[in-house]
Structure formats: C-alpha cells, structure tokens
Swiss-Prot record:
SMART domains: HhH1
Species in which this protein is naturally found: Desulforamulus reducens (strain ATCC BAA-1160 / DSM 100696 / MI-1) (Desulfotomaculum reducens)
Subunit structure: Homotetramer. Forms an RuvA(8)-RuvB(12)-Holliday junction (HJ) complex. HJ DNA is sandwiched between 2 RuvA tetramers; dsDNA enters through RuvA and exits via RuvB. An RuvB hexamer assembles on each DNA strand where it exits the tetramer. Each RuvB hexamer is contacted by two RuvA subunits (via domain III) on 2 adjacent RuvB subunits; this complex drives branch migration. In the full resolvosome a probable DNA-RuvA(4)-RuvB(12)-RuvC(2) complex forms which resolves the HJ.
Predominant location: cytoplasm
Protein's UniProt name: Holliday junction branch migration complex subunit RuvA
Name of the gene encoding the protein in the UniProt record: ruvA
InterPro entries assigned to the protein according to its UniProt record, in alphabetical order: DNA_helicase_Holl-junc_RuvA_I (IPR013849), Hlx-hairpin-Hlx_DNA-bd_motif (IPR003583), NA-bd_OB-fold (IPR012340), RuvA (IPR000085), RuvA_2-like (IPR010994), RuvA_C (IPR011114), RuvA_C_sf (IPR036267)
Length: 199
C-alpha cells in the first residue's frame, strides 16, 4: 500500500493534482479545500489507493487526520470515495467530530451528495467506529461534566475536538452569555453550534 506520495506539483485543477515523482506523473484526487504550493514546488500528500475494475485511483490529503476521516467514511454503507471526499472537502476533521458528538444531521446534509438517510447512517455507524476520535472525545465531554462545572473544562473539551484555544474560549464565552444557567454538557453543545458555521 502506498502511504503517501511526495514529489513536484506538475499540474492542478478543481479537486485534483498531478505529482511528478522521478518522471512519473501521479493523478491524485484531493479535497477542494487543500492548500497547494506553486507549480514546480514539492508537495506531499497522504494517499489512499482505490482499486476497481475500471482502473486505479489515488486520493490524497495534506493532513493525516483528513485521510483517517476519509477511510472511516468509506466503511459506512452506501458511502463511496466520491461522497467521502465531498464530506472531507466540506467538513474539516474537527467539524466532522463535532457533528458526530452532537449528532448534527444538518451539518452533513449540507454536503453535496449527502442526503438525510446517508447523513443519519454516517452518524450511526461512525459514532461507534471513531474510537480514537469521536467516541473518545465525546467521552471527554462527559468526563468534563462529572469532574467540574467550570468554563475552563468546556474549553478543554473543545480543544480535544481540535479547535484552537481562541476559538474554544470565544465559543464558550458566547454560550455562557446566551445560556448562563445551563449545565456544562448543554454549554458544550451550544458552543459547538456556535463553532459549526465558522469553518
């Protein structure tokens, strides 16, 4: 299995690149949000190779966690590479984890090609499979409720979901203003909803 491809960026377009590795050009499908260097500069993409009857296709990601999300999405019934790539393109890993943690169907149905049934299936199946991501982080949210009731714990829970210190603090502050009487679990959910449209 090819874990990554590293070479010179020979060509690019909407959702694809060609990487020149020692004179061989690899055509790789990528998320539309991938930040690329200028043509002729070195690029490294973590890859997944899809082998089908009609040929071989490479999917590449600038970050390993994007690739992990893509592979996990492929395990969901009815989700193929095209839909999985669309999800990763529209929802960064932190947003996908947040959507799973709060079972936010609306975030997923905004992705082109993802209907309500597919979104519900993704949430249902990945809630159990994302042990290193959604499940552990959702557990962190629950532990935060048990350990303390402070805003700092809410911030820490959001940091565990991949948000920056500034994003987490701002979201918690807004959540506390809009719902000062809520318990920590509800506070975190409100903060996640504040963060969801920001990415």
């Amino acid at each position: 299995m090819i874990a990554y491809i590293k070479g010179l960026l020979a060509a690019d377009g909407p959702g694809w690149v060609v990487i020149d590795v020692n004179g061989i050009g690899y055509h790789v499908s990528i998320p539309s949000t991938t930040q690329l260097p200028a043509l002729g500069h070195e690029v490294k993409l973590f890859t997944h190779m899809s082998v089908r009857e009609d040929g071989i296709q490479f999917f590449g990601f600038a970050k390993e966690d994007e690739k992990e999300c893509f592979l996990l999405l492929l395990n969901v019934a009815g989700v193929g590479p095209k839909v999985a790539l669309a999800v990763v393109s529209h929802l960064p890993p932190s947003n996908l984890r947040s959507a799973i943690a709060i079972e936010d169907v609306n975030q997923l149905v905004k992705v082109p090609g993802v209907g309500k049934k597919t979104a519900q299936r993704i949430l249902l199946e990945l809630k159990d499979k994302l042990k290193g991501m959604a499940a552990v982080e959702h557990s962190t949210l629950q532990q935060s409720v048990i350990t303390t009731g402070s805003g700092d714990e809410a911030v820490e829970a959001l940091l565990a979901l991949g948000y920056s210190q500034g994003e987490a603090r701002d979201a918690v502050k807004k959540a506390q203003k809009s719902a000062p009487e809520e318990d920590l679990s509800a506070l975190i959910k409100i903060a996640l909803k504040e963060l969801a449209p920001s990415r």
